[in-house]
A protein has these predicted regions:
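Terminal-appendage/accessory-domain detector
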Residues: 1-119, 218-228, 235-504
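Generic structural signal for well-ordered, non-membrane alpha-helices
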Residues: 23, 27, 49, 127, ...
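Hydrophobic alpha-helical hairpins/lids featuring a short glycine-rich hinge
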Residues: 101-157
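Short amphipathic alpha-helical face segments that pack within enzyme cores
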Residues: 123-131, 173, 177-181, 292-299, ...
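Glycine-rich, mobile lid/loop segments that gate access to catalytic sites or pores
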Residues: 133-228, 232, 246-247, 251
């Protein structure tokens, strides 16, 4: 692994292409290297995980609307990409399939994560890369290599370059990862991938208002849009077009004007040319449908529920988490919406105060029932909810940013004060399902998650067929990859036909 320095180049100088981060990303995407067996297994796990959460969200309004958008772009030769839930005989332009399937995967906020200098859901790469693989008739081995590239690039960028301190959304690291992954998928030249990466970054820098205040369904659309943008960038470059460069180091580029400025150095870790791509092994999924930093708080809520405390005797609940938890989903965000029962589902799944209150009261968590308006307005919940506050704890922030993965912690400590002055303390280093947690997710757990989320949505035989394809991922033919999708019976799937072509 080599740390690459990235900073704005000097005024009046030309930064050689080989010294630009986008070129180094492109070189990684176009290098031939061995595949790691554990990493390949994890690719399969991520496919299962994405399918699970997409099934669970298949008829939610944002997903239905995204599907309606894509339905207007059927592929004229019927050799495009599939839409999640629809038969493989129906294919659509890969860009629009990437959007629709990306929304389905992201909607429930329940798939994988990687948290470092910035935040990410690297599973967001999968819908776009898979759509490109289906349209270009790629086999399972090519798809696997491509996804390993996408994970490596996004997670390297998230490790080295913080976006959120400048209120830039993390999809700015997703789009170049998709472009690089598609470069690997199609065996494109380094020059082509370089141009596509530059174009993707140029178009994907959006603000974090999508995750602040009144959070809407755009939180689910944002990664799908980034994937669509990246595929369009690759397509444009394949026609011979070029892109703004150097997109990271230029005097008027991202670092100079959107991030920390021309005098700051970033360090991005990329594996050497002979090393296998293993970053995916440092990603981790969610057991519960909520922002990742709330996962451990849900598990803590279960532990508090088991104590059987009299909730009426609770006077104060101090949650001591990391900087991220406090400022993004805690009271440090200064978002009154996070304390409001009338807030959107997208806002509530980013409110650790609400999440802890519900998990504590119920001793359970459900991706739908835990967010209903009735649930949010329960008087006992509102009372407990308003007593919960967060306060950044430096030890948790330090553990969050630990450079050694084995020392990372994404948990918190909760101090409950009772009316008699007694205190009850619950602490958890990592969510139970985390690879460092009490019960790390393995292949059987991902399959179980898929069966649970798909219950009553897809037929068990269809889920078994999909699992069988994933189990044989590296050996899948192009025809198999074209069917790497779960079909939902027509009577269980809403909004499956479009009366229009185009957005309006």
């Amino acid at each position: 692994m080599t740390l690459h320095k990235v900073q704005t180049h000097a005024e009046g100088q030309v930064l050689p292409r080989q010294d630009q981060l986008a070129w180094k990303i492109a070189e990684l995407a176009t290098s031939d290297r061995p595949m790691d067996a554990e990493a390949v297994i994890m690719v399969g796990n991520r496919l299962l995980d994405n399918a699970a959460v997409a099934l669970g969200a298949i008829n939610r309004e944002p997903v239905r609307h995204a599907r309606l958008l894509a339905l207007g772009y059927a592929h004229p030769q019927q050799r495009g990409a599939t839409l999640f839930g629809l038969p493989p005989e129906l294919t659509f332009h890969c860009e629009w399939a990437a959007l629709a399937n990306g929304v389905a995967v992201r909607e429930l906020d329940m798939h994988d994560c990687y948290l470092a200098a910035d935040y990410s859901h690297p599973g967001d790469n999968i819908p776009a890369v898979l759509a490109a693989a289906q349209q270009r008739r790629c086999n399972g081995a090519a798809l696997t290599r491509a996804l390993l590239t996408s994970y490596e690039i996004q997670m390297a960028l998230v490790t080295g370059i913080c976006l959120h301190e400048h209120k830039i959304d993390h999809v700015a690291h997703l789009a170049p990862a998709v472009a690089a992954g598609v470069g690997t998928l199609l065996g494109l030249p380094t020059e082509t991938v370089y141009q596509a990466v530059n174009q993707s970054v140029h178009l994907a820098c959006a603000t974090r208002q999508s995750r602040k205040g009144d959070i809407t369904s755009w939180k689910a659309y944002a990664p799908g849009q980034a994937g669509k943008t990246a595929l369009e960038a690759v397509g444009r470059v394949l026609l011979g077009e070029c892109a703004p460069s150097p997109i990271y180091e230029g005097r008027d580029a991202v670092i100079a004007w959107m991030l920390s400025g021309p005098d700051v150095e970033y360090w991005v870790p990329l594996p050497d040319s002979t090393q296998p791509l293993r970053a995916i092994l440092d990603s981790y999924t969610k057991q519960h449908s909520a922002e990742y930093q709330a996962q451990a708080l849900i598990d803590i809520g279960f532990a508090l529920h088991a104590r059987g405390l009299d909730l009426d005797s609770v006077t104060d609940v101090l949650t001591r988490p990391s900087h991220h938890t406090h400022h993004v989903i805690g009271t440090g965000s200064n978002d009154p919406q996070k304390m409001d029962p009338d807030s959107s589902r997208e806002t509530l799944d980013h409110s650790v105060m609400y999440i802890l209150a519900v998990a504590w009261e119920d001793g359970a968590w459900h991706h739908v029932d835990s967010y209903t308006s009735e649930r949010a307005h329960r008087p006992s919940t509102v009372s407990l909810w308003q007593k919960i506050r967060t306060e950044e704890a430096s030890d948790w922030t330090q553990a969050y940013h630990a450079t050694d993965f084995r020392n990372k912690k994404f948990g918190a400590e909760v101090v409950v004060t009772l009316s008699n002055g007694d205190q009850v303390i619950e602490s958890l280093d990592n969510p139970n399902a985390h690879s460092l947690g009490a019960s790390p997710f393995a292949r059987a757990d991902y399959i179980g998650k898929l069966r649970t989320m798909g219950d009553g949505v897809a037929d068990p035989d269809e889920i078994d067929r999909f699992i069988g394809l994933v189990e044989d991922l590296e050996r899948l033919s192009a025809d198999d990859v074209a069917r790497l999708n779960i079909v939902v019976p027509a009577d269980r799937l809403q909004d499956t036909s479009a009366e229009r072509v185009g957005i309006l």
